[in-house]
Amino acid sequence: MSVMFDPDTAIYPFPPKPTPLSIDEKAYYREKIKRLLKERNAVMVAHYYTDPEIQQLAEETGGCISDSLEMARFGAKHPASTLLVAGVRFMGETAKILSPEKTILMPTLQAECSLDLGCPVEEFNAFCDAHPDRTVVVYANTSAAVKARADWVVTSSIAVELIDHLDSLGEKIIWAPDKHLGRYVQKQTGADILCWQGACIVHDEFKTQALTRLQEEYPDAAILVHPESPQAIVDMADAVGSTSQLIAAAKTLPHQRLIVATDRGIFYKMQQAVPDKELLEAPTAGEGATCRSCAHCPWMAMNGLQAIAEALEQEGSNHEVHVDERLRERALVPLNRMLEFAATLRG
């Protein structure tokens, strides 16, 4: 019998909320970061779920704001010798795996991910050992050690296409760690998938009753849903997709009002894409319920201006990402497979 870590019973150590900065402090750190980026030959790579002021700074300094797949592509191809990764720890690890010659800095190395935390490598290895006939596909939201055990790494933007491809080859699949995304992909492809039972603490909190009430209040609104959400939420969607796919859907849908079921950090780029449309947050708490994340990842919120300035100024172990070389080489194989497969989709 396989060992299975139970994320539902795990207690994730949420970080304290960052201390708000004054307007003057923000201006000071913004200018300091711009100067340090030039001095360090560094570029910012920020995820859609970071705070708007972080995304804006990445834009202004020639950096990248994107989903995890494009973050990986951008960082590997950019000529900068240092990458400042504003996101969570697995994103910094992925950057180091793909660009070992570069210095990878993060505002904090304590920025976790509930999907990563919910898939400890020892338990996952035991799970895989119990099913040796299955191809192991892991989501990008995993540690370097879990990636090293995988045959494939995948992001939500290409998950359906990859699993459909593997299914066409007759392969049976282990999917980890997100149970909701795994269920969505299985439903879309009909593939034989055995799912690990992890979940994103942000998307797992969306509630159908509260979303139904909001839909009744705004009957002309389209509902956009990330597939890390529970199936009942996905079933209510007019569009389902990764962060980049949801932004694209916001542009193509005719609706002038959009209810968005993903981390509210996406609103910065989505509003740029559809400046004339109204964006509404999908509710994360139902009747008598409270939210822990409240539609914003608490670890993404750790990527503040002060922490970014400190990362660029203070070289060393507090901010620099390191990955064991043997582990890196093993994790690079499924990551490269992902990038090569994604390239075939782009034509």
Curated annotation (Swiss-Prot):
<dbReference type="Pfam" id="PF02445">
    <property type="entry name" value="NadA"/>
</dbReference>
<dbReference type="InterPro" id="IPR036094">
    <property type="entry name" value="NadA_sf"/>
</dbReference>
<feature type="binding site">
    <location>
        <begin position="139"/>
        <end position="141"/>
    </location>
    <ligand>
        <name>iminosuccinate</name>
    </ligand>
</feature>
<feature type="binding site">
    <location>
        <begin position="226"/>
        <end position="228"/>
    </location>
    <ligand>
        <name>iminosuccinate</name>
    </ligand>
</feature>
<comment type="pathway">
    <text>Cofactor biosynthesis; NAD(+) biosynthesis; quinolinate from iminoaspartate: step 1/1.</text>
</comment>
<feature type="binding site">
    <location>
        <position position="113"/>
    </location>
    <ligand>
        <name>[4Fe-4S] cluster</name>
    </ligand>
</feature>
<dbReference type="GO" id="GO:0005829">
    <property type="term" value="C:cytosol"/>
</dbReference>
<keyword id="KW-0004">4Fe-4S</keyword>
<keyword id="KW-0963">Cytoplasm</keyword>
<feature type="binding site">
    <location>
        <position position="200"/>
    </location>
    <ligand>
        <name>[4Fe-4S] cluster</name>
    </ligand>
</feature>
<feature type="binding site">
    <location>
        <position position="243"/>
    </location>
    <ligand>
        <name>iminosuccinate</name>
    </ligand>
</feature>
<dbReference type="GO" id="GO:0051539">
    <property type="term" value="F:4 iron, 4 sulfur cluster binding"/>
</dbReference>
<dbReference type="GO" id="GO:0046872">
    <property type="term" value="F:metal ion binding"/>
</dbReference>
<keyword id="KW-0808">Transferase</keyword>
<keyword id="KW-0662">Pyridine nucleotide biosynthesis</keyword>
<dbReference type="InterPro" id="IPR003473">
    <property type="entry name" value="NadA"/>
</dbReference>
<comment type="function">
    <text>Catalyzes the condensation of iminoaspartate with dihydroxyacetone phosphate to form quinolinate.</text>
</comment>
<keyword id="KW-0479">Metal-binding</keyword>
<dbReference type="GO" id="GO:0008987">
    <property type="term" value="F:quinolinate synthetase A activity"/>
</dbReference>
<feature type="binding site">
    <location>
        <position position="47"/>
    </location>
    <ligand>
        <name>iminosuccinate</name>
    </ligand>
</feature>
<feature type="binding site">
    <location>
        <position position="156"/>
    </location>
    <ligand>
        <name>iminosuccinate</name>
    </ligand>
</feature>
<feature type="binding site">
    <location>
        <position position="297"/>
    </location>
    <ligand>
        <name>[4Fe-4S] cluster</name>
    </ligand>
</feature>
<keyword id="KW-0411">Iron-sulfur</keyword>
<dbReference type="GO" id="GO:0034628">
    <property type="term" value="P:'de novo' NAD biosynthetic process from L-aspartate"/>
</dbReference>
<keyword id="KW-0408">Iron</keyword>
<dbReference type="InterPro" id="IPR023513">
    <property type="entry name" value="Quinolinate_synth_A_type1"/>
</dbReference>
<protein>
    <recommendedName>
        <fullName>Quinolinate synthase</fullName>
        <ecNumber>2.5.1.72</ecNumber>
    </recommendedName>
</protein>
<comment type="similarity">
    <text>Belongs to the quinolinate synthase family. Type 1 subfamily.</text>
</comment>
<feature type="binding site">
    <location>
        <position position="68"/>
    </location>
    <ligand>
        <name>iminosuccinate</name>
    </ligand>
</feature>
